[in-house]
């Protein structure tokens, strides 16, 4: 075996598919956004909660029927006691487990918010990741729809706190009970029609994708897509299809409310659902939220299979350019509704709950499109350079660094190979450091430091043509007593901030 064969192979650095690294800019942008969301939730009287990223798989409801192995939608492993655990799929199922497990200690109504990563073991694609952040708020133990109305108002306030103007968003509200009433009215009530009702729900969930014509085919005989694949329909007749499409096609609720009430009159839940929608409309209007902010809209159909009452969705109405270069409406950034059954499956008794979830990554994309994120400037640290490596000199450099930090100024002492001073200035330039502190043996002997304004120096370097003039001018560099270090650095940073404001047209 030759030496080449003996040489161990390098491990290839690679990121798992569907996952991303988050850099400083992304992390700061998310922190800035979530801080504003958190402030709104706190004002509404909600408290934070954190649950583990792992839950027992059955708590997430992710076992296939007649199977002892979790389905493919979750990342799972077996504990040493052979119980299956999975990374959480959303933040709602862990909340339900927490409430059920601590029910006797929790004060109802329980108002909580959570932010954290969720995981989907699904095929990744453009903009589709296996790990992403959600920010949820929920009220558990509040049966009245006033809790749902409050959620809608909180969603609207959150979007405005993030800088999204009225007219650029709307929170749309529907009610699962009304749809149940419509389905009952067309003959799809009863347990024996559960499968057909599910097919109807799945068909109308495609309204945004296929439009009314495509949904009509899915409600009726079926639909063939462009590739020739056929999807079997729900088997409704034309009269049934027309009533379903009337419901999901309502654009002006006030104009259609009486006809809708007539359609669901006599059904077990439909009339109750219409009454709840009207109640929500009255509550939000009384609180000053007009239809430009919160709108009753039966065309909201996403998630109706999951929710048991009101369902709501926050949509952004401004245009963005998609990956094909087309102008499209940005669309949904969050939604939720009433899910009275989720906690109840642990308890064996009814536990009403309502809440919503914000897709943090998607909302961050929207805010970047609007120029509402990342505006908070982050100043890179002042660099204290190292001219000498003896203990006394290092002690002086470290003290300067700590003095700057104690004054609230970001600062770092150079930790690389200090013997090549040019590399220190290159590091400062690439890092974007605003100021460099320099003290050699001569300066240390006289108790002074050199302070170099790197931003001004970079600007002036374009105006001085030869090295001799540059050295003579000692561009943007001052010598001050060590005792004046902090004050002088603060003065330079303030001047740089003023320059940035002028450049941005703020003054």
UniProtKB/Swiss-Prot annotation:
Enzyme class: ligase
Protein known as: Histidine--tRNA ligase
A Pfam family reported for this protein in Swiss-Prot or TrEMBL: HGTP_anticodon
Entries under NCBIfam families matching the protein: hisS (TIGR00442)
Subcellular location: Cytoplasm
Main location: cytoplasm
Gene3D superfamilies: Anticodon-binding domain, Bira Bifunctional Protein, Domain 2
GO BP terms: histidyl-tRNA aminoacylation
EC number: 6.1.1.21
Subunit structure comment from the entry: Homodimer.
Parts of the chain that traverse the membrane: none
PROSITE patterns: AA_TRNA_LIGASE_II
Highest taxon, organism lineage: Bacteria
Keyword NADP: no
InterPro entries, sorted: aa-tRNA-synth_II, aa-tRNA-synth_II/BPL/LPL, Anticodon-bd, Anticodon-bd_dom_sf, His-tRNA-ligase, HisRS-like_core, HisRS/HisZ, HisRS_anticodon
Keyword Nucleotide-binding included in the entry's annotation: yes
């Amino acid at each position: 075996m030759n030496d080449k064969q003996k040489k161990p192979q390098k491990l290839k650095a690679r990121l798992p598919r569907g996952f991303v690294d988050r850099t400083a800019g992304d992390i700061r942008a998310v922190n800035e956004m979530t801080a504003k969301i958190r402030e709104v939730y706190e004002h509404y009287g909600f408290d934070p909660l954190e649950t583990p990223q792992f839950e027992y798989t059955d708590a997430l409801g992710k076992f296939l029927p007649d199977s002892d192995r979790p389905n493919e939608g979750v990342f799972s492993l077996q504990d040493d006691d052979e119980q299956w655990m999975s990374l959480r799929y959303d933040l709602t199922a862990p909340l339900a487990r927490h409430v059920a497990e601590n029910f006797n200690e929790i004060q109802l109504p329980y108002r909580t918010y959570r932010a954290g990563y969720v995981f989907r073991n699904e095929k990744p694609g453009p903009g589709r990741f296996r790990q992403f952040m959600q920010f949820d708020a929920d009220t558990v133990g509040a049966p009245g729809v006033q809790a749902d109305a409050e959620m809608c108002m909180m969603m609207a306030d959150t979007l405005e706190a993030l800088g999204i103007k009225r007219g650029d968003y709307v929170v749309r509200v529907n009610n699962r009970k009304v749809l149940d009433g419509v389905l009952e009215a067309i003959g799809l009530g009863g347990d024996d029609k559960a499968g057909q009702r599910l097919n109807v729900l799945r068909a109308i969930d495609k309204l945004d994708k296929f439009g009314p014509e495509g949904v009509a085919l899915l409600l009726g005989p079926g639909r063939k897509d462009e590739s020739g694949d056929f999807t079997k329909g729900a088997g409704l007749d034309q009269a049934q299809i027309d009533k379903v499409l009337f419901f999901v096609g309502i654009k002006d609720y006030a104009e259609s409310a009486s006809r809708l009430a007539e359609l669901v009159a006599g059904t077990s839940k439909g009339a109750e659902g219409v009454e709840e929608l009207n109640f929500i409309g009255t509550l939000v209007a009384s609180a000053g939220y007009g239809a430009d902010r919160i709108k009753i809209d039966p065309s909201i159909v996403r998630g109706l299979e999951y929710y048991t009452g009101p369902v709501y969705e926050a949509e952004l109405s401004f245009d963005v350019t998609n990956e094909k270069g087309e102008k499209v409406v940005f669309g949904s950034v969050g939604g939720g509704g009433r899910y009275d059954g989720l906690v109840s499956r642990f308890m064996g008794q009814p536990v009403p709950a309502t809440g919503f979830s914000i897709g943090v990554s998607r909302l961050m994309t929207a805010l970047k499109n609007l120029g509402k994120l990342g505006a908070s400037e982050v100043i890179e640290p002042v660099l204290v350079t190292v001219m000498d490596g003896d203990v006394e000199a290092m002690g002086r450099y470290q003290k300067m660094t700590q003095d700057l930090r104690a004054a609230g100024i970001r600062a770092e002492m150079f930790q690389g190979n200090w013997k090549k001073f040019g590399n220190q200035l290159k590091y400062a330039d690439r890092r974007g450091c605003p100021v460099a502190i320099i003290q050699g043996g001569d300066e240390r002997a006289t108790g002074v430091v050199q302070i170099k304004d790197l931003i001004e120096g970079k600007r002036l370097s374009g105006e001085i043509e030869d090295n001799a003039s540059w050295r003579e001018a000692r561009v943007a560099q001052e010598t001050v007593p060590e005792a004046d270090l902090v004050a002088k650095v603060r003065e330079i940073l303030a001047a740089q901030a003023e320059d940035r404001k002028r450049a941005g047209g703020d003054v």
